[in-house]
Amino acid sequence: MPIRVVCLAVACAAVSVLPVRAHHSHTNYDISTWTTMEGTVVEVHRLVPHSWLYVEIKDAKGQTATWALEATGPGGLEKVGVKVNDVRPGDSIKVRCHLLKDGATGCLLGFVTPMHGDAARGHGIERDWDGGGGAGFPATGRFAEPAAR
């Protein structure tokens, strides 16, 4: 009996040090198609596990809606060079993202291009806000030019 207890304790200890990682899928997004949009940032939330941009975007009829744009977390953004002040509320931005399949005003961010005019904060430089390996993207961080929708 004592050998079983020792073996069980060793097995439990070995399993407990394995990295634990859980994540939801991105099946609610249409990752087969890119959409390009422009708007004004309302809020920026750099949270774990996902950061969020809330952006006012006008549709073809001129109606404005607030869109929720899901990005990678702060660590992933930092890893690919996105700085805290690159995008702030009130900034104009252009995004490329994957829309929600249900038609709601939200998308999975791929890229953000700040259009605020401040070169020190990356004006006109497109940055990867998915962290270089998320939903539908190759792990290398190299991306094919998407087709606009």
Regions found by a protein language model. Give the residues of each.
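PEST-like low-complexity, intrinsically disordered acidic/proline/serine-rich tracts
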Residues: T27-W52, E56-R149
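Sec/Tat signal peptide C-region and signal peptidase I cleavage site
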Residues: L18-A22
